[in-house]
């Protein structure tokens, strides 16, 4: 079956880079850099739609639902990257944000032939994951037409999940299936069709916003501090101490003592120092207020 890609913005030729192969290295990189500067503006143009998805994800998290990313190639890898960073950054369950890629784990490192063209695989991967009406699915594809993602979106709609798209081509087949469309139109790529470049950068910026925004909305950030960070290495042990110090103004000794008394739960240590509660009482108070430090502090 012949596929017509000529109408896709991401497949168009970029006039600014038509002679990039004869430029000096600095000139070549200047063209790339100038094109990259358009990406943040394209994302800015869709902030209201991104906000709608963030709010939907926050509701899902608070209702026992999950955020599921699905994509092929670069798009799938970006979803997996974003999902994998949530547990160490926010202390979230690894099952809370999940990234799926056409072709499975082996496709993370190496392309799997024809996997992205398998519409049924997109659906069955979600079925295996037990997708349900509490979940939010974000279908990621620069083209907006990847069969694997379309199959996943159709299945998600059939079970009542909230469905959003992240693509870089307006009026794509994916937009017809979604409840919320996020379409940062970044224009033609420097290398024609290489959507890992501007489109991929736009996708990464949006994914950062989705999980960061949802985690803030569910109490995992106090001020601008990642108060649910887990101390899984030496750097993060020190970061926990620094966060407690920044949040409370206490000494390093006081921060260390508080953390040691609450099994290194950063959020609990902060509440202990600020409220004078012991570890057990601070944990209970946080649980009472769904992990929101500000709400726990106001209930004194």
Swiss-Prot record:
Residues 57-220 form the SIS domain. It is an enzyme of class 4 (lyase). A lyase-type mechanism (elimination/hydration) is suggested for the cleavage of the lactyl ether bond of MurNAc 6-phosphate, with the formation of an alpha,beta-unsaturated aldehyde intermediate with (E)-stereochemistry, followed by the syn addition of water to give product. Homodimer. GO terms for molecular function: carbohydrate derivative binding; carbon-oxygen lyase activity; ether hydrolase activity. CDD domains: SIS_Etherase. GO terms for biological process: 1,6-anhydro-N-acetyl-beta-muramic acid catabolic process; amino sugar catabolic process; N-acetylmuramic acid catabolic process; peptidoglycan turnover. The keyword Lyase applies. The keyword Metal-binding does not apply. It comes from Aliivibrio fischeri (strain MJ11). Keywords: Carbohydrate metabolism, Lyase. HAMAP family: MurQ (MF_00068). This is N-acetylmuramic acid 6-phosphate etherase.
